[in-house]
Amino acid sequence: MRTFTLIWFGQLVSTIGSYITDFALTLWAWEMTGSATALALVGFFSQLARMPITLVAGLIVDRFNRQRLMMLGDGVAALATVGIALLYLADSLHIWHLYAAATLNGGFGQVQSLAYQTSISTLVPPSQLTRANSMNSAVHYGAAIFGPALAGVLYPLVGLLGIAGIDLVTFGAAIATLLLCHIPQPPPRAEADLETRFAKLTFGFREVWRQPSLRSLLLITTVFWFFHDFGGAVYNPMILARSGGSAAALASAAAAAGIGGVTGAIFLSIWGGPKRRFKVMLAGFIGAGLSKTVFGLGRSPAIWMPAQFCSSLNFPLLGSAETALWMQAIAPEKQGRVFAANSLVLQGMSVISALVAGPLADRLLEPAAVTDGWSSTGLGVIFGTESGAGMAFLYVGCALAMMGVGIGGLFRSKPQQI
């Protein structure tokens, strides 16, 4: 457990640094473009790079040294940060450079993440796995609390160049902890022939398709995450537009999300998890959608922070219930391939939502929000007519759709049979 804790600490520090940089780059991109599309495309290129890697990441991690793969992922991310810093220093940084960096980080980050996840079972005894997984949840939510808050304070003081320097130091901490530790490799498996390897790539899809209850579960979760990511694509630009580009407003919302997630995870660990998992997952869908609806209707941090806290409170609950359903329905030796297939489907939906949401907001909804027709229908009263109103309309629409998925799922009998 000591070795895992040291590596975990390095990953926590590195993730906080990444959140600081991502936050600063979001502010820089908004200052340069004022475009929801520009921000959404960063997520698009990151997810686009992950999709083909997801198909083969399991084979890569099983074949090559996982410790070196983790260092490779951190090293590539550090090089991307150096590249951005040099371009900024030369006054040559453009928005498309962020897309290139997102593509690079997305692909290598997928391998790095899987190498880290699959190393846990070789570092931690079975009795400590639950504790280790709880610590991993803290990496994301803890970074979500501290990263944006630090960036909101540091960005006005040290600028993008200073933020990049801090990020490089955190990458160094992650790589140093890996160099100080030894991660045992699992026993090598017999090499499969080429045909078998290609068959493995489609096994997860075939396994889900074979069982009607799993098909229905995947459909429900895919539709939910599609609307979640569709609204999420305009989340940052909506806050920045509504707040006049305030870094403090964006940081406060991000911190509230982290606190809500940590609170939900702590509650879940004390409770021990639900028994009627499918209905609890749907309740999480409804709760998240309701909270996001309130968030989208708000126009200041006074509304955004409590609404975001309540929204994030639901995700550890719905996420754990969904994962438990899959684990309950799929044999352990098949779970990796099935989870990879599910991940690929969700990534595809995320790519589509990121590609469509930004242009829809910029070219249709934001211009429509300043027309007389917008006010005459009552939308002006609900969402306002200032900058960000069109994005708020889109965000609330997606939140209501998330609620609809949760309510509609109550009438689906097949997933309840799992």
Please place each PLM-identified region on the residue numbering.
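Cytoplasmic helix-loop-helix junction between adjacent transmembrane helices
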Residues: 101-144, 148
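Juxtamembrane intracellular "pre-TM" segments in multi-pass secondary transporters
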Residues: 1-4, 183-219
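C-terminal transmembrane bundle of multi-pass solute transporters/carriers
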Residues: 42, 52-56, 63, 69, ...
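Structural signature of transmembrane alpha-helices in multi-pass secondary transporters
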Residues: 14-15, 46, 136-140, 257, ...
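Helix-loop-helix hairpin linking two adjacent transmembrane segments in secondary transporters
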Residues: 90, 140-177
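Short hydrophobic/alpha-helical segments at membrane-entry points of transmembrane helices
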Residues: 6-7, 93-101, 216-217, 302-308
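Helix-loop junctions on the cytosolic side of multi-pass membrane transporters
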Residues: 91, 118, 122, 164-195, ...
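Small-residue hotspots at the loop-to-helix junctions and early N-terminal turns
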Residues: 21-24, 28, 33-43, 134, ...
